[in-house]
């Protein structure tokens, strides 16, 4: 597939890294020549220096015969105009744009379609982050929760702790503890190394366990791996930007929410707009302010400013002063590895959320959901099975007969409204949504090939 990526920042560069090794012809466009040279030194791709919305630049990038344009520059307006130019001048069939501003996202249905601004798929990073954080608030103790099949199935990542009934026992004993609940442990990471789970695998404290279950059973499975935490009640947010304000708006009906904003004018605006959130003007690294607002009674402290260092430092201070759990938004990928699991309980990467959303639209075969996991090393995907026994490598076959790539596990199959946790004898049918987990994303091309019907596959 011939793909043009506009923007060589963290998202554009990471997307190129994900796609360049999958038999794609990638061209990256950016105004920053140094960024482009860095990418070209690392990967086998073309680069074009220039403004991504200019017709001349797009023509030079190969828009005449491109299959897809992905606009992820730092400017919403550039991304929108680029999609319009690609549609009007080059008839590029697939156009994806990252749009940050809530003003545009709010009216997306009216703004973005072929008769207006021709964007096929809109990626709204701030909304993705809000959704991710909200899911983690719904499941205290989870490190990550990803929904598939319109929310019917979830993949959850939890750390195993002493106190969980399964610790020190084989995975096969889970059925004895939960006879009426089906789940599939897709992977276990122990000391950062993947273990392919078997029934005889002993779960150890400290293991990072990835499991798939019907969404309504997630809490029950979590209770096998750790003592369930009490639901959060008191939440303190730091940062009143798009993410902080959007999160407060979503939480304030069900939780006691306080928000700290260091810009006085912005704090005043939020105090007027938010109905049940208490807004403070101040600095979250101010110990006196935190003490006055009873940080020791806060169940969850969430720092979502656009400053990584400020988020990390304020969260560390809050934890030291008694906040039960702290979560931070981190832009730099290197920081995520450094802080998660130390004093910081959970680090959220907006880039990772954006990449996951983008990959679900650029994967081959009928891939309808993608989640990039463990800082991009692993991947969970939702693929739709098409064809019949003569044209498909999966349709009409039981799971045990399917030649899955190394490190790939089928976790669940959704058929209509029915969720079926995978077992060796489950037969895949036309139209099934198949949820898979890959401990190594380098095999994603092999998985895509499995789900591409072909009369010549034999």
From Swiss-Prot:
SUPFAM superfamilies: NAD(P)-binding Rossmann-fold domains, TrkA C-terminal domain-like. Keywords: Cell inner membrane, Cell membrane, Ion transport, Membrane, NAD, Potassium, Potassium transport, Repeat, Transport. The keyword Ion transport applies. Residues 143-227, 368-453 form the RCK C-terminal domain. GO terms for molecular function: NAD binding; potassium ion transmembrane transporter activity. Part of the constitutive potassium transport systems TrkG and TrkH. May regulate the transport activity of TrkG and TrkH systems. Binds to NAD(+) and NADH. This is Trk system potassium uptake protein TrkA. It comes from Escherichia coli (strain K12).
């Amino acid at each position: 597939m011939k793909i043009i990526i506009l923007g060589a920042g963290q998202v554009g560069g990471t997307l190129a890294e994900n796609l360049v090794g999958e038999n794609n012809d990638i061209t990256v466009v950016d105004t920053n020549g140094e960024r482009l040279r860095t990418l070209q030194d690392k990967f086998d791709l073309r680069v074009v220096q220039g403004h991504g919305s200019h017709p001349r630049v797009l023509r030079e990038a190969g828009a005449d015969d491109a299959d897809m344009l992905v606009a992820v520059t730092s400017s919403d307006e550039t991304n929108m105009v680029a999609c319009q130019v690609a549609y009007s001048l080059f008839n590029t069939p697939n156009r994806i744009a990252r749009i940050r501003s809530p003003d545009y996202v709010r009216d997306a249905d009216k703004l973005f379609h072929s008769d207006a601004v021709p964007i096929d798929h809109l990626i709204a990073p701030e909304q993705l982050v809000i959704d991710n954080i909200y899911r983690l608030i719904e499941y205290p103790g989870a490190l990550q929760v990803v929904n598939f099949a319109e929310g019917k199935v979830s993949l959850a990542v939890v750390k195993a702790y002493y106190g969980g009934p399964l610790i020190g026992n084989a995975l096969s004993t889970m059925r004895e503890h939960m006879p009426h609940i089906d789940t599939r442990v897709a992977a276990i990471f122990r000391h950062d190394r993947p273990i392919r789970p078997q029934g005889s695998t002993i779960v150890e404290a400290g293991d990072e366990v990835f499991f798939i279950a019907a969404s309504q059973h997630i809490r029950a499975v979590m209770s096998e791996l750790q003592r369930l935490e009490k639901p959060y009640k008191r939440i303190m947010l730091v940062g009143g930007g798009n993410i902080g304000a959007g999160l407060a708006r979503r939480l304030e009906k069900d939780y006691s929410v306080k928000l700290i904003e260091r810009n006085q004018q912005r704090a005043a605006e939020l105090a007027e707009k938010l109905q049940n959130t208490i807004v403070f003007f101040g600095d979250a690294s101010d110990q006196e302010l935190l003490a006055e607002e009873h940080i020791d009674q806060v169940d969850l402290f969430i720092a979502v400013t656009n400053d990584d260092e400020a988020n990390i430092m304020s969260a560390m201070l809050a934890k030291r002063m008694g906040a039960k759990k702290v979560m931070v938004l981190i832009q730099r990928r290197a920081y995520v590895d450094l802080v998660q699991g130390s004093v910081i309980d959970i680090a959220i990467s907006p880039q990772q959320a954006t990449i996951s959303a983008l990959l679900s639209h650029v994967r081959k075969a009928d891939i309808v959901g993608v989640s990039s996991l463990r800082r991009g090393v692993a991947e969970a995907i939702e693929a739709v099975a098409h064809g019949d026994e003569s044209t498909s490598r999966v349709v009409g076959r039981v799971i045990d007969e399917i030649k899955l790539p190394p490190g790939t596990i089928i976790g669940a199959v959704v058929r209509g409204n029915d969720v079926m946790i995978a077992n060796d004898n489950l037969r895949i049918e036309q139209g099934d949504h198949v949820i898979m987990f890959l401990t190594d994303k380098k095999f994603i091309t092999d998985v895509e090939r499995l789900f591409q019907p072909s009369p010549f596959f034999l």
